[in-house]
Amino acid sequence: MANYFNTLNLREQLDQLGRCRFMDRSEFATEADYLKGKKVVIVGCGAQGLNQGLNMRDSGLDVAYALRQAAIDEQRQSYKNAKENGFEVGSYETLIPQADLVVNLTPDKQHTNVVETVMPLMKEGAALGYSHGFNVVEEGMQIRKDLTVVMVAPKCPGTEVREEYKRGFGVPTLIAVHPENDPKGEGWDIAKAWAAATGGHRAGCLESSFVAEVKSDLMGEQTILCGMLQAGSIVCYEKMVAEGIDPGYAGKLLQYGWETITEALKFGGITHMMDRLSNPAKIKAFELSEELKDLMRPLYNKHMDDIISGHFSSTMMADWANDDANLLGWRAETGETAFENYPSTDVEISEQEYFDNGILMVAMVRAGVELAFEAMTASGIIDESAYYESLHELPLIANTIARKRLYEMNVVISDTAEYGNYLFANVATPLLREKFMPSVGTDVIGKGLGETSNQVDNATLIAVNETIRNHPVEYIGEELRGYMTDMKRIAVGG
């Protein structure tokens, strides 16, 4: 199979990369009706599979789970997940031929095998659904021409898909139809009904493409969403402990600090996050973030280039063929880092203290979001896609670190995201350790500036504020957050 994106000419590539339109709520007036009375069969019952299925059932759809016979016979976790929640469970051979929509929610590395197995069993004119387009775009899966191929990609982990639905809300969702597979012209009707059944239409849906979803998703998760948080956690912890800060305090400041700092980002963008700092601290964070952007821009651009060219996906698929040797080795190394093993502490840290003593963390967030956004948009990805795959998802990933450190983040994200995270962090960590961290002190990470006066130069502060507020990510962010008026707040510090 050939990489689908690389078979397109330049005009087609740019057209697909630039697809992203915020859909009006009126476009979902019929909600999930198009799929009512039809059979939805989900393959895979992990976090996305189970939680999307629960939402779809609660929205009035007929949902069942098709699992491999071995998973049923051995009563594996996927079987238990489905059975304990009262779903019909059967083998591929039993359920797939009945399905009007087969939703493939297995891990990326299983997609080729799963699709090649279920496709001969699917009835004429049925639909095949994905929540990530890697198999179609990067592996170039050829799908039977009578089948409609759609994507509904919630922009958060599966557990959040369920929790937001139960609140009567949803999570922002990208939807797409594969242009090579829409024989009856019903792809958008199916995708919209599926998205509405998960609750996504209540938070906002973006009409996208398989290409735009894959390329932006890979870039976001490798850099700011996971790689930057991992590298930042490791080097900031090392710095604080080396400078005599209590390891328990240092670890807690980072573990819960990312979540607290990005919570401000969620509600008011980079502008509001920076406004949570005192004026002297804001100027310091701005200066640090400018240094970080200069240092790390080549690394961000390399990741974007490797994603666009297909080099990243071919490298990762080679590791799949080698039994995930690199992935598993890097996972073990992460578990051995000092931050992952810091001693627990009862020390209390107030919400504002996370900002005051985490100035460098704020700088890393600003630098990382802006660099990821800039690399994506410079490559033809439209602002809306770049926003969702950088700034918007960051608080959701930071929340996983607050639960169980980097381990939890890497468990919750996909293996594809985890592999890309390590690729980035393995370069970013020594880069920061050698080229940046020696020049910073505990005034920006661990202790705070301790200023007795809030006095700053007026012209400097005005210039800093102007630069922060006039970045393109702030303009599109303000527009898109306007559609998400019911975002929930976190409980600070776990």
Curated annotation (Swiss-Prot):
InterPro entries xref list: 6-PGluconate_DH-like_C_sf, 6PGD_dom2, KARI, KARI_C, KARI_N, NAD(P)-bd_dom_sf
Catalyses which reaction(s): (2R)-2,3-dihydroxy-3-methylbutanoate + NADP(+) = (2S)-2-acetolactate + NADPH + H(+); (2R,3R)-2,3-dihydroxy-3-methylpentanoate + NADP(+) = (S)-2-ethyl-2-hydroxy-3-oxobutanoate + NADPH + H(+)
Active site location: H132
Record-listed Mg(2+) 1 binding positions: D217, E221
Start and end residues of each KARI N-terminal Rossmann domain: 14-208
Function: Involved in the biosynthesis of branched-chain amino acids (BCAA). Catalyzes an alkyl-migration followed by a ketol-acid reduction of (S)-2-acetolactate (S2AL) to yield (R)-2,3-dihydroxy-isovalerate. In the isomerase reaction, S2AL is rearranged via a Mg-dependent methyl migration to produce 3-hydroxy-3-methyl-2-ketobutyrate (HMKB). In the reductase reaction, this 2-ketoacid undergoes a metal-dependent reduction by NADPH to yield (R)-2,3-dihydroxy-isovalerate.
Descriptive protein name: Ketol-acid reductoisomerase (NADP(+))
